[in-house]
From Swiss-Prot:
Predominant subcellular localization, coarse grouping: cytoplasm
Name of the featured protein: Methionine--tRNA ligase
Family label: Belongs to the class-I aminoacyl-tRNA synthetase family. MetG type 1 subfamily.
Cofactor note: Binds 1 zinc ion per subunit.
InterPro entries for this protein: Anticodon_Met, Met-tRNA_ligase_1, Met-tRNA_synth, Methionyl/Leucyl_tRNA_Synth, MetRS_core, MetRS_Zn, Rossmann-like_a/b/a_fold, tRNAsynth_Ia_anticodon-bd
Domain of life: Bacteria
CDD domains named in the record: Anticodon_Ia_Met (cd07957), MetRS_core (cd00814)
EC number(s) stated in the UniProt entry for this protein: 6.1.1.10
Residue numbers binding ATP: 333
GO cellular component, as recorded: cytosol
A family per Pfam: Anticodon_3
A GO MF label: ATP binding
Length: 551
């Protein structure tokens, strides 16, 4: 029976272009997993959207001389275009200015307040006497209280990933004027996170998290304290009973997963469809995020869900990446350590980029993109192993007139059957890797299967068999090689969708109805009918070069 699967990626801030680090961290892994679950035949909904409130946006919009809505509209389109170019197979890309979001945020707030989990408190906050206003989050910078980095933001350190209040910074100053800030009393609404420690620990104990994430978040939850969920800004969702205050972006943003699903349901003219994913406990919910978003997704948002009465689906698995670097340093457009996505894709194929990002994904530790590694992986793995196996077999078949290959039990020898069994074993291993969210191991399985195919072809040497007049034996070897290629395309599809589709198109297997499949959302192939070798027929087409060498 198919499972219902809800997949979300962290909502990207609508305040700048996406870089390779973002893609390798939260978006390519989610896309790969969504494609894998569709192949299994599951009912998948992959949701994301722009995060359009918060101080980072007001700060950059003011610097750009643009209105806030104009600014987020611009980056919403840029992000959507980027995801389209990268073939991130989102079912819907929403935004936190969608028509459902405001009312939903207000409902969360009202429910949490009615249960005594939100209360107004007076506290000391950072104030700029020069600018005559309170400043917080990214309007503030200073020295990180954890690692000592000077230039840390007011809500998190971009160097070590620490999460804190702006008042925790050492020597805080205004991001705009550079002036020293003072502490001044003001009133804000506070979420009593410390009252949610036990429910959160119980929830985390039942959820799937990578061990490095689990260790961090358990310690984090044990030290929770009340947290302000309001800000003194003009851009944001107004707090219903608190004049001149808006909600803190990390209170409203995660609710965007739910409102974004409502937005999707409206777009498909089935306004109640969102409930199948958010109000059904049987739904499997997997979140993909970056390292710096762990506290908000593993503690604050679950606390918001647990603290109110509507049984919204809580995440079953939280997949968090570490940092992805460029040549050993953080991606930074202002510092020149940056790759223009459009220019890169004008030079190199999309699947080459997807493969290298997957093979070097920062799954359990920081990793990096380097041009030397990109070139090496493309040429030695995609061209030397993968592409070579496909092209040599299909080119030989066409040159020697083998247009249709049909399974014949009598023509298969023990070594052929062992080869097919070994191929099936690797496919099963790939399934396990995808199921456990490991792109790196999936890439290894892809190359292992390609290498197995090359070894088989080398050992059987169909060119020699042909010279010896053993055409029936050549046909058996080519059939087995093509069957392996069909499986190779299957396990490659989540990472290399364009390449996999080309392979299937050249093989034209009887077991795959290409006409009735959407090549961007191939569904229900990972099943016994597709694997059944006894009924398979290949109607080969003229081969096309799959992978070109990177100079």
């Amino acid at each position: 029976m198919p499972s219902r699967v809800l997949i979300t990626s962290a909502l990207p801030y609508a305040n700048g272009p996406l870089h390779f680090g973002h893609i390798a961290g939260a978006y390519l892994p989610a896309d790969v997993y969504a494609r894998f679950r569709r192949l299994l035949g599951d009912d998948v909904l992959y949701i994301c959207g722009s995060d359009e409130y918060g101080i980072a946006i007001t700060l950059n919009a003011e610097r750009a001389g643009l209105g806030y809505q104009e600014y987020v509209n611009m980056y919403h389109k840029i992000h959507k275009d980027t995801f389209d170019k990268l073939k991130i197979s989102l079912d819907f890309f929403s935004r936190t200015t969608n028509p459902f979001h405001k009312a939903l945020v207000e409902d969360f707030y009202t429910q949490l307040k009615s249960k005594g989990l939100i209360e107004n408190q007076t506290s000391l906050q950072l104030y700029s006497e020069e600018e005559n206003r309170f400043l917080a989050d990214r309007y503030v910078e200073g020295t990180c209280p954890r690692c000592g980095f000077d230039g840390a933001r007011g809500d998190e350190c971009q160097k070590c990933g620490a999460d804190y209040e702006a008042t925790d910074l050492i020597h805080p100053r205004s991001k705009l004027s550079g002036s020293e800030l003072v502490l001044k009393e003001t009133e804000h609404a506070y979420f009593h996170l410390e009252r949610m420690v036990e429910p959160l620990l119980d929830f985390i104990d039942k959820s799937y998290l990578p061990e490095h994430v689990r260790k961090f978040i358990v310690d984090y939850i044990k030290n929770l304290r009340p947290r302000a969920i309001t800000r003194d800004l003009s851009w944001g969702i107004p707090v219903p009973d608190f004049p001149n205050k808006v909600f803190y972006v990390w209170f409203d943003a995660p609710i965007g997963y739910i409102s974004g699903t409502m937005d999707w349901a409206a777009s498909v003219n089935n306004p109640e469809a969102w409930k199948d994913f958010w109000l059904e406990e049987s739904t499997e919910y997997v979140q993909f995020i970056g390292k710096d978003n762990i506290p908000f997704h593993a503690a604050i948002f679950p606390a918001m869900e647990l603290g109110q009465s509507i049984p919204y689906k809580k995440m079953d698995a939280l997949i968090s990446s570490e940092f992805y670097l460029l040549e050993g340093a953080q991606f930074s457009k202002s510092e020149g350590n940056y790759i223009d996505m459009d220019a890169f894709l004008d030079t190199y194929s999309l699947d080459k980029l997807r493969y290298v990002l997957a093979a070097t994904a920062p799954e359990t530790s920081d990793s990096e993109f380097t041009f030397l590694d990109f070139k090496t992986r493309c040429n030695s793995e995609l061209v030397g192993k993968f592409g070579n196996f496909i092209n040599r077999v299909l080119a030989f078949a066409e040159k020697n007139g083998f247009k249709e290959l049909v399974y014949s039990e009598t023509l298969l020898e023990d070594k052929d059957k062992k080869f097919l069994d070994d191929a099936q074993r690797i496919v099963q291993e790939a399934r396990e890797h995808y199921s456990k969210y490991s792109l790196r191991k999936a890439c290894s399985a892809i190359m292992e299967l390609a290498a197995l195919g090359n070894i088989y072809v080398n050992d059987q040497a169909p060119w020699k068999l042909l010279k010896e007049g053993l055409a029936h034996r050549v046909e058996a070897v080519l059939f087995c090689a093509c069957y392996c290629q069909k499986l190779l395309a299957l396990i490659s599809y989540p990472i290399l969708p364009g390449t996999a589709w080309e392979i299937w198109n050249m093989l034209s297997p009887k077991s795959l109805d290409l006409v009735n499949q959407d090549k961007d959302r191939v569904k229900n192939l990972w099943n016994s009918e597709f694997f059944d070798v006894s009924d398979e027929v290949f109607s080969l087409k003229t081969p096309q070069l799959l992978c070109a060498i990177v100079d």
